[in-house]
Amino acid sequence: MTLSFVTRWRDELPETYTALSPTPLNNARLVWHNTELANTLSIPSSLFKNGAGVWGGEALLPGMSPLAQVYSGHQFGVWAGQLGDGRGILLGEQLLADGTTMDWHLKGAGLTPYSRMGDGRAVLRSTIRESLASEAMHYLGIPTTRALSIVTSDSPVYRETAEPGAMLMRVAPSHLRFGHFEHFYYRRESEKVRQLADFAIRHYWSHLEDDEDKYRLWFSDVVARTASLIAQWQTVGFAHGVMNTDNMSLLGLTLDYGPFGFLDDYEPGFICNHSDHQGRYSFDNQPAVALWNLQRLAQTLSPFVAVDALNEALDSYQQVLLTHYGQRMRQKLGFMTEQKEDNALLNELFSLMARERSDYTRTFRMLSLTEQHSAASPLRDEFIDRAAFDDWFARYRGRLQQDEVSDSERQQLMQSVNPALVLRNWLAQRAIEAAEKGDMMELHRLHEALRNPFSDRDDDYVSRPPDWGKRLEVSCSS
């Protein structure tokens, strides 16, 4: 089957990019590809059998027209000016059978005009982390970019030490970022901001294109998508680590996996990025930061959208987030209805978990085994203060009984939303260390496991992290 590519970005958004081709690596070789995603995108298996090829920037497919996008942004709350694709190149937009498109974005593809002080490269470590994280999030049901392939090489790339240079093929319906809009707003080119908005509506909100109120309705949906995404992050214990405005997806996707982390111990103030000295992007601050970022996006639209309409949309953020978060947390607790004591029960559990540094994922997974008429629970052994747990657990079981639902039905629901497996940093690190020695088996094993996060397992993928795996420091160097 021949793949079809279109050039909408190149044709419709002049002055938002620089056309250029990838710079191949030395002795590049394909070490992993996403068979399931490739099948979904109707990519012929033969493309993965001819060396690095398109996956390593050594060839282009017919119809591809590679370019690097320009955007700007606020980083750690400070205006950073022009940024852009410093090491990534949009190879093309694949036209799918249903008329939608999928960006093929090659990360680590070499220098671009937007590389600033960088070398345009990515390392094997970071490409593995992004591939694992984006696929883990996808199978958890959270909107995200996807990873299609990883290429490694003999080209050394220098970060804290010399590391193998690599490339990641990332795919997404769009790479539109808040930062695209900021770039032209701060250059006082509001007409180009409007062009970006029209492009987004035309291709991703086409049902609004002929509506005279299209900009307000569109921005309201961007707010809602963002609120929903953040609610989902919070419920699975995901910390992004670097929520700069240039890393915010207009479509509400999880974008740009850098120093991310999933909670091990329940620590509301968890900081996964060791460069985040003030804790701006701590786990519990993510909802507030996302709203701040939406406010920056709203500012860029103010030349052609009424400020009252923008503020009305922004005012809806908290309610949308709390609604999604509340629904998801009730499911995690096994509540079939909404009762006034639910928030108190959840907050008391969180307080108990924070005091005891309980494992976030294991606690909710073990809670899924609760029998409403039995005081016995394997979760009890996870707590030192048994009296405090017993007191909470008795009230929790009383709440379950109000719903008049069988244990089996409730447990099935809870186990479908409380994963047994999340991508803990130590699991990623183990796969990385093996891969850097040339052994890709653990990378493939872990990818396979992450496809079934809600299935029970009896291996170390679902155990507490070992001592060496706790508090692994992760930075933006990738």
UniProtKB/Swiss-Prot annotation:
Pfam families, per database record: SelO
Binding annotation for ATP: 84, 86-87, 107, 119-120, 170, 177, 256
Active-site residues per Swiss-Prot or TrEMBL entry: 246
Family: Belongs to the SELO family.
Role this protein plays: Nucleotidyltransferase involved in the post-translational modification of proteins. It can catalyze the addition of adenosine monophosphate (AMP) or uridine monophosphate (UMP) to a protein, resulting in modifications known as AMPylation and UMPylation.
MF terms in GO: AMPylase activity; ATP binding; magnesium ion binding
Species of the source: Shigella boydii serotype 18 (strain CDC 3083-94 / BS512)
EC number: 2.7.7.-, 2.7.7.108
HAMAP family attached to this UniProt entry: YdiU_SelO (MF_00692)
Cofactors that this protein relies on: Mg(2+); Mn(2+)
Coiled coil: none
Protein name, as recorded: Protein nucleotidyltransferase YdiU
Residues reported in the UniProt entry to bind Mg(2+): 247, 256
Catalytic activity: L-seryl-[protein] + ATP = 3-O-(5'-adenylyl)-L-seryl-[protein] + diphosphate; L-threonyl-[protein] + ATP = 3-O-(5'-adenylyl)-L-threonyl-[protein] + diphosphate; L-tyrosyl-[protein] + ATP = O-(5'-adenylyl)-L-tyrosyl-[protein] + diphosphate; L-histidyl-[protein] + UTP = N(tele)-(5'-uridylyl)-L-histidyl-[protein] + diphosphate
Keyword Repeat: no
Record keywords: ATP-binding, Magnesium, Manganese, Metal-binding, Nucleotide-binding, Nucleotidyltransferase, Transferase
